[in-house]
């Protein structure tokens, strides 16, 4: 039996869900698995283990079984509570945090025995591998950004040189064109002077002057 009740704190990004189960003669084992799905890290905080009102006057022993895929086959179950109705009907568990999956077993006694606690989910906690993957992705993004910035800087440094190189031939062409125009203007002026009637008249007068006799 799971008691579902959720609460969250924004500061720590933690969600807690009430949890409980019953061990008895009919069901001697119970495996805890997270109720919420996702990449949140989950812990089971075990609070109390107590006998039911119908429990017999006998010793009830509750233990945690080792994981089924445990490599070390020599690992033994761990007893967490020994209860008896007239002596110790309930125990409080302080600071007990378990990682799922966790299997509880009623080793001795007929029950019922009730276990209660909280499921604690921390959305901000990541596994070591996930943290490494995220750090690797961030480093790759930073390297790509640095490469882009270097490429932009190199383009900015090269572009003024290219502009200067382009301006030099343009300047030389304008100087050559100017000289050509000046030369053409001089030729035009010379041809105009040669064709002037005043200059021709002076030339003929000078040619006839030596021909007069006294």
Swiss-Prot record:
Residues 198-214 have a biased composition (Basic residues). It holds the Pfam family Nucleoplasmin. Transmembrane segments: none annotated. The record marks 57, 84 as: Interaction between pentamers. Residues 127-155 have a biased composition (Acidic residues). A motif (Bipartite nuclear localization signal) lies at residues 165-180. The keyword Cytoplasm does not apply. Signal peptide: none annotated. Residues 129-152 are annotated as: Acidic tract A2. Keywords: Chaperone, Chromatin regulator, Developmental protein, Fertilization, Nucleus. SUPFAM superfamilies: Nucleoplasmin-like core domain. InterPro entries: Nucleoplasmin, Nucleoplasmin_core_dom, Nucleoplasmin_core_dom_sf. It comes from the Eukaryota. The keyword Nucleus applies. Gene3D superfamilies: Nucleoplasmin core domain. Residues 119-214 are annotated as: Disordered. Homopentamer, when bound to H2A-H2B dimers only. Homodecamer of two stacked pentamers, when bound to H2A-H2B dimers and H3-H4 tetramers simultaneously. The acidic tract A2 mediates histone binding. Belongs to the nucleoplasmin family. This is Nucleoplasmin-2. The gene is NPM2.
